């Protein structure tokens, strides 16, 4: 895959992520903050971005979303087959809730 293709795919992922994040924040800010792992400050900014600002941010050559499964226990919980899927999801949610939210610091 060529470098220009990779950059284009990063921009597409960024735009899709920003559009989803903004929609989640506008529909239910508290739930969005939990699902996205962002602070109220970031959620407020996401909610106010214009379409032009979203496109400009998405044009970055860096991936804007962060892989939150940096905890081995969490990743193992989500990738192993469990007899009780609901308990597995609840355990994953508890582990994610322990992680600090991202801020503008």
UniProtKB/Swiss-Prot annotation:
Its main location: cytoplasm. It holds the Pfam family FlhD. Keywords: Activator, Bacterial flagellum biogenesis, Cytoplasm, Disulfide bond, DNA-binding, Transcription, Transcription regulation. One of its GO terms (molecular function) is DNA binding. Coiled coil: none annotated. The keyword Transcription applies. One of its GO terms (biological process) is regulation of bacterial-type flagellum assembly. It comes from the Bacteria. GO terms for cellular component: cytoplasm. It is found in: Cytoplasm. SUPFAM superfamilies: Flagellar transcriptional activator FlhD (SSF63592). Belongs to the FlhD family. The C-terminal region contains a putative helix-turn-helix (HTH) motif, suggesting that this region may bind DNA. Homodimer; disulfide-linked. Forms a heterohexamer composed of two FlhC and four FlhD subunits. Each FlhC binds a FlhD dimer, forming a heterotrimer, and a hexamer assembles by dimerization of two heterotrimers. Functions in complex with FlhC as a master transcriptional regulator that regulates transcription of several flagellar and non-flagellar operons by binding to their promoter region. Activates expression of class 2 flagellar genes, including fliA, which is a flagellum-specific sigma factor that turns on the class 3 genes. Also regulates genes whose products function in a variety of physiological pathways. This is Flagellar transcriptional regulator FlhD. The lineage of its organism: Bacteria, Pseudomonadati, Pseudomonadota, Betaproteobacteria, Burkholderiales.
